[in-house]
C-alpha cells in the first residue's frame, strides 16, 4: 500500500493554479438571480446555474474553499457572513437565497452540539437576510440528523422561525442516490416561498439509480490494500443500496488481520468497512481529511481517487481543485450533490415560484410544526 508520505508528495502536483478563463461563468441570460451563502467550493452554485440561475453574491469564510471557488467561477467569495460589511455587500434585490448552513453541529460525525455550537447559530444570519431582502425563494440544506437533533426541537425552532418571517415552509429528506449519483447521501431540504407552497412530490418520484462501478476510473494510480487486509465475507446488500464487502469494527481483528489495520480504521468513524462497486457509496465525510473509503472492484480492494469522489458528488470533469490532497477531500465532503440541487432548482422554476409575484403572501400563523416531511 502506498504510504502517507507518497500521498503528500503528490499533493503539490494536484494543486491547480487559478485559471485565466474560469470554466463556470454565469449564463448570459438568466431565469433568476440568487445569492450563495456558506458557499463552500460552489456545489449549490453549479446546480442552480444548471437550472438557469445567475449568482449575484457569494459568501464563504474558509480560505481554501474560497480559492477553489475563485478558480472555478472567477470571483472570490465575500468572507464571514456575520460581519456587517459582508452583509452590506449583498444586493438589495435577488430572487433566491441558498444556504447549506454548517451541518457539523447537527451531524452524527460531529459532536451534535446544535445551537450550543457557534456554527449552529449561523442559521440566524440567514433569517436576518431573509427579513431584510425578502427573496421569493429560500433553499436550505442540512444533514439528515437535523430532523432528530434535540428530540426534534432544533428543526421545529428553525421551521417556526421561517414561518414567522411570512414564508410558506415545506421540507423533506432527499437522497442523492435518486438523482443520478452512486452515493447514499440523505439530506434535509427546506424550501421557503412567498407566493405559494412548494411541492416536493415530483422530486420524491425521482429514482435515477446508478451504481458506483459506472463512476470509477478504469486506469490510473490506485492505492490498493495488501492481501493481508482482504479477508472478505459474502457481500451483504442493504436497503440503502450499500453493499458491505468487508468486516466491520472489531470483527476484522478477530480473523487474524495485520495489526496495521489501524490505517483502515480511520474511515469516518465507520471502521473497517469496505463497499462493493456494484452498490452505492456512503455519504462522503465532511470531517475526515484523509477521505479513506475503500471499495471492492474487480476482486481488489482500493481507495477511491479524488476524481472519483468529486464525480460521485456530481461535479463536472473540468472542475478545478485547489489545495493539498487532504484539503481537497475535505472540500468535496463538505459540499452538496450538484445534480440534486439542479433538480430542485428546475422544479422551483417549473412550479412558478420565481416570476414576480403580485404581492407577498401573508405571514403564516406560528404554532406547533409537525416533524413529518411535507409534500
Task: For the regions a language model picked out, list residue spans one by one.
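S-adenosyl-L-methionine-dependent DNA methyltransferase catalytic core
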Residues: 1-55, 161-165, 173, 183, ...
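Core alpha/beta nucleotide-donor-binding catalytic domains of modification enzymes
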Residues: 2-137, 144-156, 163
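Conserved S-adenosyl-L-methionine
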Residues: 78, 167-178
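Short glycine-biased active-site loop of nucleotidyltransferases that positions the nucleotide triphosphate
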Residues: 89-90, 180-183
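Short, histidine-centered active-site or binding-site loop motifs used for metal coordination
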Residues: 110, 142-144, 288, 325
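Short beta-strands and strand-loop turn motifs
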Residues: 137-143, 172, 322
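Short acidic/polar capping segments at secondary-structure boundaries
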Residues: 144-145, 176-179, 195-197
Amino acid at each position: 500500500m502506498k504510504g502517507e508520505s507518497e500521498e503528500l508528495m503528490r499533493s503539490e502536483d494536484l494543486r491547480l493554479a487559478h485559471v485565466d478563463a474560469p470554466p463556470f461563468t454565469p449564463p448570459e441570460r438568466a431565469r433568476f438571480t440568487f445569492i450563495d451563502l456558506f458557499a463552500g467550493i460552489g456545489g449549490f452554485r453549479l446546480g442552480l446555474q444548471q437550472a438557469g440561475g445567475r449568482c449575484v453574491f457569494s459568501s464563504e469564510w474558509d480560505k481554501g474553499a474560497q480559492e477553489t471557488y475563485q478558480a472555478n467561477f472567477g470571483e472570490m467569495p465575500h468572507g464571514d457572513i456575520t460581519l456587517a460589511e459582508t452583509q452590506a455587500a449583498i444586493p438589495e434585490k435577488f430572487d433566491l437565497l441558498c444556504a447549506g448552513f454548517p451541518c457539523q453541529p447537527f451531524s452524527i460525525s460531529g459532536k451534535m452540539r446544535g445551537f450550543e455550537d457557534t456554527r449552529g447559530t449561523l442559521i440566524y444570519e440567514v433569517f436576518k437576510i431573509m427579513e431584510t431582502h425578502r427573496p421569493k425563494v429560500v433553499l436550505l440544506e442540512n444533514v439528515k440528523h437535523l430532523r432528530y437533533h434535540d428530540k426534534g426541537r432544533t428543526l421545529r425552532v428553525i421551521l417556526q422561525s421561517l414561518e414567522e418571517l411570512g414564508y410558506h415552509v415545506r421540507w423533506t429528506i432527499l437522497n442523492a442516490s435518486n438523482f443520478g449519483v452512486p452515493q447514499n447521501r440523505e439530506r434535509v431540504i427546506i424550501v421557503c416561498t412567498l407566493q405559494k407552497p412548494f411541492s416536493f412530490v415530483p422530486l420524491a418520484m425521482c429514482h435515477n439509480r446508478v451504481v458506483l462501478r459506472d463512476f470509477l476510473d478504469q486506469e490510473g494510480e490506485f492505492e490498493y490494500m495488501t492481501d493481508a487486509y482482504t479477508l472478505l465475507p459474502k457481500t451483504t446488500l442493504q436497503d440503502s443500496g450499500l453493499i458491505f464487502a468487508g468486516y466491520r469494527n472489531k470483527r476484522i481483528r478477530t480473523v487474524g488481520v495485520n495489526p496495521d489495520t489501524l490505517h483502515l480504521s480511520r474511515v469516518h468513524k465507520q471502521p473497517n468497512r469496505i463497499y462493493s462497486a456494484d452498490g452505492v457509496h456512503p455519504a462522503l465525510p465532511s470531517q475526515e481529511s484523509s477521505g479513506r473509503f475503500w471499495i471492492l472492484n474487480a476482486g481488489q480492494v482500493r481507495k477511491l481517487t479524488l476524481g472519483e469522489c468529486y464525480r460521485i458528488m456530481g461535479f463536472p470533469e473540468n472542475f478545478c481543485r485547489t489545495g493539498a490532497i487532504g484539503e481537497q477531500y475535505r472540500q468535496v465532503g463538505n459540499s452538496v450533490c450538484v445534480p440534486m440541487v439542479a433538480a430542485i432548482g428546475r422544479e422551483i422554476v417549473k412550479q412558478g415560484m420565481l416570476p414576480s409575484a403580485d404581492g407577498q403572501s401573508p405571514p403564516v400563523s406560528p404554532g406547533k410544526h409537525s416533524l413529518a416531511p411535507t409534500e
